[in-house]
Amino acid sequence: PIDKMVYVVGNEQEYHFKVLSISLDRLGFPFGKELVHFSYGMVELPNGKMKSREGTVVDADDLMAQMIADAKEISKDKVNTLPDITEEEANEIARVVGLGALKYFILKVDPRKNMLFNPEESIDFNGNTGPFIQYTYARIQSVLRKAGNVSDTSNLSNLSNLSDKELTLIQRLVDYPAAVRQAGDEFSPAVIANYAYALACDFNSFYHDHSILNEADNYKRALRLLLARTVAKV
């Protein structure tokens, strides 16, 4: 039996799939009503819509190569601060950052809307971008490495006397399952992408105001490390 059929096709085919769904239903096929047209908008460049007849179409392989090259140039100052990094490792970082920037910029937009893709904006380490989220993850991993073995967290049940920033971060983590359900119900990866950005913002705000590694109170230190590890896991 067919529970649901999802066709991922551009929004210019919307009428076709509406007619197809209605036709199947009237012909007695029970799955007619379960046909979903997951339409997506067109990708436009800063100087206008991509059109093959006008030669303004950008090849995906060329775009990815350019994003990786731009990422290598933009991130070189940060990469050069890493001790003993090899050229191969630097190239891998550029690949991950460049492709992450491209993927996130596309995913964060409601897929049913047209999107203006700006390569320079997508690769910025500040703002609603993939590199910003990746940098937040790298920051957390650095903290966890420096922390070493974390004490047992099974007794971290006392959530009294928490700051507003800590409570906000905890609430954001609690909201994760609901965000996943919403993304599934709406066929919208943008929900997850924008949740990840909001989570990164909340963590950075928390990290700015609260010491983790230098916290003298062992309970608070363990709790904050647990929060950091959970954010990274999500």
What residues fall within each predicted segment?
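Non-catalytic interaction-recognition regions
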Residues: P1-V234
